[in-house]
Amino acid sequence: MSLGEGKLIYEGKAKRVYLINNEELVMEFKDEVTALDGARKEYAPGKGKLAASQTAFFMSYLNESGVRTHFINWDGDRRIHVRRLRMIPVEVIVRNYAYGSFIRRMPLIKPLTKFTTPLVEFHLKNDELHDPLILIEDIIEAGLTSMEQVMEIRSVSLKVNHLLSELLGKYGLTLVDFKLEFGVNSNGALVLADELSGDTMRVLMNGKHLDKELFRMGGSVKELIEAYSRLNSILGLGLKG
């Protein structure tokens, strides 16, 4: 399906967003990869299509499983058609295993220790401040959203974690952690937004990363594309970069 160009309204490290009309947007995934808050940036041919296909796969699955998402359809290439939302400037990280920034702030726990229950973290979405960890009370005091909506975000995030962990587990994959973003639609309902791909989740197959962690650890673009392609192959998406 071909998706129209629209008006460019946002460009970030990994995506461009185009306005189609008051209710709909197109998200275009770039053939670029960044790490270390953009300090390392390289051209990655085929990555956009791989990330878009993964997002389409996971978002479609969540839609079918009763989670309201912004996803409408995928053009078969680097673009997805989504619903326009009023975004909440908070990133949610759900952790099943100790890894990454969690280890840096809590070194008493060994890497890849499985948590007794999943952890849900809230981070202020702010590149200049490096998306700092914040409290629920911070969110309320800053007026970013209501306590009721924060609790709904937490509940939906845990549901998404359960669904994705179960799905990936069927393929022999381990979901270490992942990032979510949410928005509110014109009716005031909470909606899962942004993307779900190797860019925003850590997924292991027999202890090996099939996600952007490879690049963060100094791996090459070629290794990254091979990992994303491997994830697609395992999920039966039939795509290569």
Curated annotation (Swiss-Prot):
GO biological process assignments: 'de novo' IMP biosynthetic process; cobalamin biosynthetic process
Reactions mediated catalytically: 5-amino-1-(5-phospho-D-ribosyl)imidazole-4-carboxylate + L-aspartate + ATP = (2S)-2-[5-amino-1-(5-phospho-beta-D-ribosyl)imidazole-4-carboxamido]succinate + ADP + phosphate + 2 H(+)
Protein family membership: Belongs to the SAICAR synthetase family.
Domain of life per record: Archaea
Gene name as annotated: purC
Enzyme Commission number(s) from the entry: 6.3.2.6
Protein name: Phosphoribosylaminoimidazole-succinocarboxamide synthase
Enzyme class: ligase
Keywords, ordered alphabetically: ATP-binding, Ligase, Nucleotide-binding, Purine biosynthesis
Pathway: Purine metabolism; IMP biosynthesis via de novo pathway; 5-amino-1-(5-phospho-D-ribosyl)imidazole-4-carboxamide from 5-amino-1-(5-phospho-D-ribosyl)imidazole-4-carboxylate: step 1/2
GO MF term set: ATP binding; phosphoribosylaminoimidazolesuccinocarboxamide synthase activity
